[in-house]
Design a protein with these regions (language model features):
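Short, intrinsically disordered, charge-balanced linker/junction segments flanking boundaries
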Residues: 2, 23-24, 89, 176-180
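Active-site region of chymotrypsin-like
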Residues: 33-42, 107-114, 139-179
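Positively charged n-region of N-terminal signal peptides that target proteins for export
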Residues: 2-8
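Conserved hydrophobic positions within beta-strands
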Residues: 55-57, 89-92, 147, 175
């Protein structure tokens, strides 16, 4: 009976340390940064739902990015923040079908929204990268990976090839570096 008791006590302790170890790997900036990621819902001319996906704010005044495919054929679009607030997309500022990216303005309902800061320099090949998914939950599971390749697009923008396993619903979620 004493051996069985040791096994019973060791298992919960082992699970506790495994959970603590996995939580420690999530960068500190995740809690703040996840509030900048939102869900996008687009509607057709009959006000029927067309597509859903993700996007994120890149400025506190409502400038945002998402994938262009979501907006094709849409009459209007709404973003839903991680807190559940709905805000309409008010203006399309630019789109690129080849790279499947769209830049737009959201009619924010607050003074400012949480935004991600675009990195000034490209990460090195082999650098750690985190995919920050949209989540309404308190805890968030980032997907980690490495930068496999960095190339230039249009002379000034960087295009990254990443080594990470993503789910379909992670399209248009931001990729973060070690600094967040």
């Amino acid at each position: 009976i004493m051996i069985d008791m040791k096994k019973i006590l060791i298992l919960p302790l082992l699970l506790f340390f495994l959970i603590q170890g996995s939580m420690a790997q999530t960068p500190k900036w995740v809690e703040k940064a996840k509030r900048a990621v939102f869900s996008v819902v687009t509607y057709d001319k009959n006000d029927k739902m067309l597509n859903t996906g993700n996007g994120f704010f890149v400025s506190e005044d409502g400038l945002a990015l998402s994938d262009y495919t979501l907006f094709k054929g849409a009459e209007r679009a709404v973003v839903i923040t991680s807190e559940g607030k709905q805000m309409p997309v008010s203006l399309i500022l630019g789109a690129n079908d080849m790279y499947d990216v769209i830049k737009f303005r959201v009619a924010i309902t607050e003074k400012k929204v949480p935004a991600l800061i675009v990195a000034k320099t490209a990460p090195a090949v082999g650098a750690d990268a985190w995919m920050l998914p949209y989540s309404t939950q308190k805890s968030i599971a980032c997907v980690t990976g490495k930068v496999k390749e960095v190339s230039k697009v249009a002379g000034e923008y960087h295009y990254y090839t990443l080594g990470m396993q993503m789910k379909d619903k992670m399209v248009s979620c931001p990729v973060m570096n070690a600094e967040g």
